[in-house]
Amino acid sequence: MATKKGTRKRRVKKNIETGVAHIHSTFNNTLIMITDVQGNAVAWSSAGVLGFKGSRKSTPFAAQMASEAAAKQAMEHGMKTVEVEVKGPGSGRESAIRALQTTGLEVTAIRDVTPVPHNGSRPPKRRRV
């Protein structure tokens, strides 16, 4: 079967002033997604995408690099101000927020939206190292 050549969609440059930066920080990785106010994705990045593998993905430095990469993508679309929503218990939370501020995006609000169970499912067993 013949494959089509060069039929990929071109990325349309949007002009978005304000957005929401969703930082999902787990124990193993940090994901940053920058959306517009409605929730449509503008830019995203993660520690794994940038080449960090294994235990290096969970470091604050990897979260900082991922945050800078996502912020640069969003600024190409004209973004200037962001609200930050942080979710999860990971180590890259603060460094990701700081990296957003240093790249030139103005952070207007920081919200912690970590889901807290009302005694939901049983947590994983304690590690014995």
Curated annotation (Swiss-Prot):
Keywords: Ribonucleoprotein, Ribosomal protein, RNA-binding, rRNA-binding. Pfam families: Ribosomal_S11 (PF00411). GO terms for biological process: translation. The keyword Nucleotidyltransferase does not apply. Belongs to the universal ribosomal protein uS11 family. Part of the 30S ribosomal subunit. Interacts with proteins S7 and S18. Binds to IF-3. This is Small ribosomal subunit protein uS11. It comes from Limosilactobacillus fermentum (strain NBRC 3956 / LMG 18251) (Lactobacillus fermentum). The lineage of its organism: Bacteria, Bacillati, Bacillota, Bacilli, Lactobacillales. The gene is rpsK.
